[in-house]
Amino acid sequence: MEQDSDLESGRATNQRPPRVRVRGAGVRGRGRVRRRALSEGQRRSPFRLDDLQLPDSLYVTRALQRDHALEMPRGQVDFSLIEAEERRAGPTDEWYFESVKTYRAKPGDDLQTLIKNYAKISLECGAVYEINSKIVVTGACYIIGNCAVLRANLPVGTAMFEVLNVDVIPSIGFMERIVFSNILFDCRSTTAVVCCISERNTLFHNCVFSGPHMLCLDIRAGAEVRGCHFVGAVCALRSKGLYSVRVRNSIFEKCAFGVVSGSKASISHSMFKDCACCIMFGGQGTIAHSHFMATTCTDTPMNLQLCTCEGNGSHVVPLGNIHFASNREAPWPTFNANVLVRVRLYMGRRRGVFHPKQSTFSMCVIAAPRGVVQRIYLFSVYDATCAILQLGEAGDAATERLCTRGMRHNTPSLRAAYVTDTRIDREINSQDTAEFFSSDEDNL
């Protein structure tokens, strides 16, 4: 009993005193809403912008300021200062294309000196620049053409630009290679010159090569050609060496030679019209999503008789509109989704099987020597009006023809025989299958 009385006394002492709620002035009742000192539009922020000490108008929290240092953009500087700074402190990643000051060249200026001193050159829109001497480029070069015209007044065979691998190109973002953009290379009918001889990786973007150029681009160290237009040139592009060349979204029109490549080449989304030899591949390559068309066989340059030589002229064969030279070490070029109209495709001796998947051969001829015809696979190919010819020598009859290397050779005449047993038996294989389906059609 004494223990129970002690517990009751302990509970009485630990309990809180009862609350006494009195309704009166300044006391909120259950049914009243507390009045706000400020309205919704006048509500104060939990912090002030002045407390953050922001460097600009962006809302940057203090945590980000501790982890990241905001660097304000600097103005453009001369190329010579960037070059001198790199020589002193070494390559850095703080300079980009927009950091280099642009020099606006005028007609009559010495372009070779301007390129060496400023590297980033802008030409006047629509102006005509007379090139009276060869321009040698030894270092960085980025020319913004603005549709300016470069007209050559040079002897036959002289190059307008010669790019040499002499000086070191500074570490500037998006200026790592030589760039020619939006330039119209004009060649008068009296002088056949070379537009550019490059021994460095070069980019030609949206340029036009008009006139009877002896050779538009002589690529010796790799290049990328995109969005360019070649009209009436003797040879549009020639590539040799161990470096690859890439051609995209370009047009070749009325050229004696389009692309002559002895190295690895890639051609995509381009058009070749009325070229005596659209493509001549001596090595590996890829041709995809391109259009080859011949509209006449009597006008220049389609009436030219051309040839190509192998083994320093020991083996000479007539040149086709699309020509794959013999190379026992290289496989056939990848040939996908192309359209050929009135074109002659010549195939030399190579490894593997040639499969022009998803390609259209309209009124075309595929010519190949003995033993190569059996390696042509026409599955999933539109070949209703395509003929396959097997070539053989006709005897001692020969004609002199112009070679891809600029020389002339006596080319033997060839005898052709039709081959008809390379097609699939359509009485057994249906066309209502996935044979002509491509996964790329899902993206269209």
UniProtKB/Swiss-Prot annotation:
The keyword Phosphoprotein applies. GO terms for molecular function: ubiquitin-like ligase-substrate adaptor activity. Its main location: host cell. It is found in: Host nucleus; Host cytoplasm. One of its GO terms (cellular component) is host cell cytoplasm. Pfam families: Adeno_E1B_55K. Keywords: Early protein, Host cytoplasm, Host nucleus, Host-virus interaction, Modulation of host cell apoptosis by virus, Phosphoprotein. Interacts with host PML-4 and PML-5; this interaction promotes efficient subnuclear targeting of E1B-55K to PML nuclear bodies. Interacts with E4-ORF3 protein. Interacts with E4-ORF6 protein. Contains a PML interaction motif that allows the subnuclear PML localization. Plays a major role to prevent cellular inhibition of viral genome replication. Assembles an SCF-like E3 ubiquitin ligase complex based on the cellular proteins ELOB, ELOC, CUL5 and RBX1, in cooperation with viral E4orf6. This viral RING-type ligase ubiquitinates cellular substrates and targets them to proteasomal degradation: TP53/p53, LIG4, MRE11-RAD50-NBS1 (MRN) complex, ITGA3, DAXX and BLM. E1B-55K probably acts as the substrate-specific adapter of the SCF-like E3 ubiquitin ligase complex. This is E1B 55 kDa protein. It comes from Canine adenovirus serotype 1 (strain CLL).
